[in-house]
């Protein structure tokens, strides 16, 4: 099938942090349109594809994206007009070649990705198909287990917690709807516990709380308390996941990590994590070491990878070259997937496919700067990834993804699968 792209345009809109981002629209020959907004991260891996910002301090404190918008309207549009909207790989290849750099720094990953996503949406809309079905075909049916970021630390908060995200994982349920309900009830229970202990319960960028607690371990204890008080069983119905974002507390010059006010070597930090895993129902740990500390990842996965999902985010940046190195070294048993780390839909799908073929799980993820766009909800089902990270149980830009997944589960009906603990196929649980 050949359906011509007749118009491509972009504009500057705002993300959930009030910072500018790129929205693209792609129009097909019959007038069908696809629209997409790109997200933006706060803690970014150094190997990520680059978003372009204007750096004009007089506009949006230098964070404007008029240059990226111009790149869509003046460079990308002429190249894509006349192309087949149903040939996503060729569209994305054209975008990559048009940019010509390894990290998409000429046109900007924000410009390229907005268009790539909008093309996929336009094609789905033309066929009258939901996006997940267009991208994933008839076998797209697995609803993801949500990893819900309810306590924030690190670069996502102005508090004294080193680890960036403390998540609840409602994996012991039979449907996404039930898992979401459990997550919401635990979130509200957690708010009450924190409030009664005198903590501020304002929420951060991803909708989680950012209390000043005595240690990272105390944050885990508070989560366990919230799970139990909400009427659920930790370690059976609801588990804990951590995103350490260890690059943010790593001193490159000294080669040490700073955790709970102490210097720790990779080996000592490994022991610290192992103690936490032994004491608490922790099922997933993301970026436990800095993005270049390959040896530590390999050793840690060797030690605990049979019972804990070890996830590479900054380590891989959704890049198949870095992922193939990780597969070869057995550095992790899971990868975090972020569309804007790599910059096109096709490359994102390639990374998921490579991971799954090598018995690694893939977690489809949001960024801290999000929007009302629900592309990643459909992507999670399209790829049967089994996992999604899309924030806490507050803030509309996070809830939008959860609500889209509720719709998809309802639409799939009896075909829908929520695999719960079985989604953790790379560990022996």
UniProtKB/Swiss-Prot annotation:
| NCBIfam families reported for this sequence | eno (TIGR01060)
Q: Which cofactor does it need?
A: Mg(2+)
One example of the protein's molecular function in GO is: magnesium ion binding
Q: Which pairs of positions does the record mark as disulfide bonds?
A: none
Q: How is its activity regulated?
A: Inhibited by fluoride and phosphate.
For this protein, the record's PANTHER family field holds: ENOLASE
InterPro entries linked: Enolase (IPR000941), Enolase-like_C_sf (IPR036849), Enolase-like_N (IPR029017), Enolase_C (IPR020810), Enolase_CS (IPR020809), Enolase_N (IPR020811)
Instruction: Name the enzyme group at the top EC level.
Output: lyase
For the ligand (Mg(2+)), the binding residues are 243, 286, 313
Organism annotation: Thermotoga maritima (strain ATCC 43589 / DSM 3109 / JCM 10099 / NBRC 100826 / MSB8)
Sorted UniProt keywords? Cytoplasm, Glycolysis, Lyase, Magnesium, Metal-binding, Secreted
Name it: Enolase
* Similarity comment: family membership: Belongs to the enolase family.
Catalytic activity annotated for this protein? (2R)-2-phosphoglycerate = phosphoenolpyruvate + H2O
The protein's pH behavior is summarized as: Optimum pH is 7.5.
Q: What Enzyme Commission number(s) does the record list for this chain?
A: 4.2.1.11
Q: Where does (2R)-2-phosphoglycerate bind?
A: 164, 338, 367-368, 389
Report the Pfam families cross-referenced here. Enolase_C, Enolase_N
Q: Does the keyword Secreted apply?
A: yes
Describe the temperature dependence: Optimum temperature is 90 degrees Celsius.
Its gene is: eno
Provide the active-site residues from the annotation.
206, 338
Top-level taxonomic group? Bacteria
Q: In which pathway does it act?
A: Carbohydrate degradation; glycolysis; pyruvate from D-glyceraldehyde 3-phosphate: step 4/5
Q: How does it assemble?
A: Homooctamer. Forms a ring-shaped particle.
